């Protein structure tokens, strides 16, 4: 049951989901058939099952949504998942109803943008070994392979590529953008602005920290990496989104990232804070109402059109100039 107070609408139910989203392993994430990722009947775009070879020799599998009836190459976007293993929809194994990346892809492709989303390495249909063994740098290389794939498609305008990253994905997007001038816009959702040890301390204070585990290469990088040093070098337009009830990354990190980007000389930065939204961009009050009304998980975990519209409006503006 959801519990309400004056400051935060919390729920053990939502808590369990978020813990799984952020900390669970790849075990149990199925290789779903292409039909699972097919658009709804009548959608003005197609969904194609695609394979992407990485420089390390891993085969990643994903879905490319492409607008129908195009007469010229269209802009393309790649979606970047957070720090836990997920399929291409950003779903954990036990809660496939959470499909934020499907929602984003649908909204963008309905408006003329091609979108590539991929199962994390070692998860779903993708190869590459255990996801937990991959460092942030290696994950960035996976996304670079996706960028190369998009640029090689005749349907895609290789000069109009954008990135949308959530959580760790919001660390990866700037890492790529500062080294690839073909990336012309990035969206950072719930992105950290401090080293990982500070994030871990915050999570411990909110009671959301995962179980202690032995240090691995991913954790070593996460603890030492300073996102602000990279943010200062970003030159493309940036949209920063954050929920003010984020239990994983403090909401003030949004403005810290924006300040760092502007400090580096890039003034094309937009910040949107969503009152009542958590790290997964779930509106907690709306989730409370839906659960009380007996709505299914697919409805409870659906991201509000408010968030989706902010993303799609901004991306369309920046990529179709």
PLM ranges: what are they?
Residues 287-321:
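Catalytic active-site module of serine/aspartate enzymes centered on a nucleophile-bearing elbow/loop
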Residues 33-72:
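N-terminal cap/lid segment of alpha/beta-hydrolase-fold proteins
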Residues 69-73, 77-107:
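Short, surface-exposed "cap/lid" segments of acyl-processing enzymes
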Residues 236, 250-260:
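Short alpha-helix in the alpha/beta-hydrolase fold that links the catalytic acid
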Residues 184-185, 198-229:
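Mobile cap/lid helix-loop segments that gate and shape the active-site cleft of serine hydrolases
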Residues 145-203:
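Primarily recognizes the serine-hydrolase "nucleophile elbow" in alpha/beta-hydrolase
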Residues 234, 240-242, 246:
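Short beta-strand/loop motif that positions the catalytic acidic residue
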Residues 100, 132-154:
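Alpha/beta-hydrolase active-site loop
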């Amino acid at each position: 049951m959801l519990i309400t107070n004056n400051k935060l609408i919390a729920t053990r139910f939502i808590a369990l989901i978020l813990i799984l989203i952020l900390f669970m392993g790849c075990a149990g994430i199925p290789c779903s058939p292409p039909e699972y990722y097919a658009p709804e009947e009548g959608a003005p775009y197609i969904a194609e099952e695609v394979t992407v070879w990485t420089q390390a020799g891993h085969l990643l599998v994903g879905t490319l949504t492409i607008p129908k009836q195009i007469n010229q190459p269209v802009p393309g976007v790649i979606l970047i998942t957070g720090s836990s293993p997920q399929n291409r929809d950003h779903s954990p194994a036990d809660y496939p109803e959470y499909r934020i990346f499907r929602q984003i892809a649908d909204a963008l492709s309905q408006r003329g943008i091609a979108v590539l989303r991929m199962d994390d390495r070692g998860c779903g249909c993708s190869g590459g070994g255990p996801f937990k063994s991959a460092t942030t740098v290696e994950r960035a290389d996976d996304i670079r392979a996706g960028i190369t794939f998009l640029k090689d498609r005749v349907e895609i305008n290789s000069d109009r590529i954008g990135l949308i990253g959530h959580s760790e994905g919001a660390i990866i997007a700037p890492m790529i953008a500062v080294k690839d001038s073909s990336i012309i816009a990035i969206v950072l959702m719930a992105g950290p602005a401090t080293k990982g040890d500070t994030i871990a301390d915050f999570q411990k204070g909110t009671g959301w920290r995962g179980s202690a585990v032995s240090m691995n290469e991913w954790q070593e990088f996460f603890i030492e990496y300073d996102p602000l040093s990279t943010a200062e070098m970003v030159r493309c337009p940036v949209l920063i989104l954050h929920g003010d009830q984020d239990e994983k990354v403090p909401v003030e990190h949004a403005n810290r990232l924006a300040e760092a980007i502007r400090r580096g000389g890039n003034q094309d930065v937009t910040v949107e804070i969503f009152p009542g939204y958590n790290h997964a961009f779930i509106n907690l009050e709306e989730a409370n109402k839906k659960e009380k009304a007996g709505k299914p998980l697919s409805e409870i975990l659906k991201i509000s059109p408010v968030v989706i519209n902010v993303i799609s409006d901004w991306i369309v503006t920046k990529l179709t100039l």
